Regions:
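Membrane-interfacial amphipathic/re-entrant helices at transmembrane-helix boundaries
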Residues: 1-20, 48, 58-63, 89-93, ...
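Membrane-embedded helix boundary and interhelical linker motif in transport proteins
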Residues: 8, 30-77, 81
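Helix-loop-helix "hairpin" substructures at the membrane interface of multi-pass membrane proteins
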Residues: 13, 131, 135-213, 237-243
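Short, non-helical or kinked segments that cap or interrupt transmembrane helices
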Residues: 15, 24-46, 60, 88-93, ...
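Transmembrane alpha-helical segments in multi-pass inner-membrane proteins
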Residues: 17-19, 57-69, 192-199, 203-269
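Alpha-helical transmembrane segments within multi-pass membrane transporters and channels
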Residues: 24, 57-101, 108, 242-247, ...
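Hydrophobic core segments of alpha-helical transmembrane domains in multi-pass membrane transport
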Residues: 46-50, 68-74, 99-107, 146-155, ...
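Transmembrane helix-bundle core of multi-pass membrane transporters
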Residues: 56, 85-160, 187-190, 211, ...
Length: 291
């Protein structure tokens, strides 16, 4: 029974990682860049939801929508101001810029709201379902269900809509997409908007499970979600889901059966082993370069 309890907890944690990983996957798949400031967008989403629910006394759903709107706007602004001028720049320049944006958001949050922790309000039910000796909290069930709904909606959007087709075209060949009349810059901005909106959803779910908010809130979840995206295949949306769930389960099991202090090391060690065997990730495609 302890194993099942840890498995469910791992699925709940992994669902948060999966939602965050979808942001990494979409941005890399279309813009071919790694947005290492993505974790700090989660932090901004957490603060936005916190103030919407406590200072403005909004109900839960409007509060979440306010956080999503805030992060969506932030994602577009960051893309336009920081990343758009670097379209033709080297990967190193983009990486340095992403790290700079990350530090800017962290220090900006600390300047505005101080480093003192803030407690996210208990807006979701604290009850649990009982299956014999197994207890599953409603928050965990909501987290898992939200992840699945997000995954299905995003997959349908990418595969069944005209905008989704444009995104797939940009992912395959931006120059060809331009010749077909697709506004590539607009598609990239939309991708950042969607990824940042998902970061806000993940922020609320993360704070519902771990209610302490600080300016560094998004750092470790962001790193683990990036690990999940690489684990599953950085350009694969199903891979982001699979990677997130597996990383969550591995972390939960490592905490339960090995050591809480070593759990992160175990997660990254498993990632290295997988990449040695499958460099493209579990569901990633091997890329062949024509000479």
């Amino acid at each position: 029974m302890r194993f099942l309890s840890n498995l469910v907890n791992g699925l709940g944690l992994g669902s948060v990682y999966a939602i965050i990983a979808l942001g990494y996957t979409m941005v890399y798949g279309i813009a071919k860049m790694l947005n290492f400031a993505h974790g700090d967008v989660i932090m901004v989403g957490a603060y936005a939801a916190f103030f919407a629910l406590t200072k403005f006394n909004l109900p839960l759903i409007p509060g979440i929508l306010a956080a999503i709107l805030c992060c969506t706007v932030l994602g577009v602004v960051v893309e336009r101001l920081a990343y758009k001028p670097l379209r033709q720049a080297s990967s190193l320049s983009v990486l340095i810029t992403a790290i700079g944006v990350s530090y800017f958001l962290q220090n900006g949050a600390q300047l505005l709201w101080t480093a003192s922790p803030k407690m996210f309000p208990a807006v979701m039910s604290g009850g649990a379902l009982q299956f014999g000796d197994l207890s599953i909290s409603y928050i965990t069930l909501i987290t898992i269900a939200t992840c699945l709904v997000v995954m299905v909606c995003l997959t349908l959007f990418i595969n069944k809509t005209k905008t989704g087709s444009a995104m797939r075209a940009c992912s395959e060949d931006k120059d060809a997409a331009r010749l077909m009349g697709i506004n590539v810059n607009q598609i990239i901005s939309l991708t950042f908007a969607i990824g940042s909106g998902l970061a806000a959803v993940a922020a609320v779910l993360l704070c519902a499970n771990y209610p302490t908010i600080t300016p560094t809130l998004g750092s470790m979840p962001g790193i683990k979600a990036f690990t999940a995206a690489v684990f599953g295949g950085i350009e694969s949306i199903p891979g982001a889901l699979l990677g997130g769930l597996l990383i969550g389960i591995i972390e939960a099991m490592a905490k339960a059966y090995i050591s809480t202090q070593l759990a992160n090391s175990v997660v990254f060690a498993v990632l290295l082993i997988v990449l040695l065997v499958r460099p493209a990730g579990l569901l990633g495609k091997r890329m062949t370069e024509k000479v």
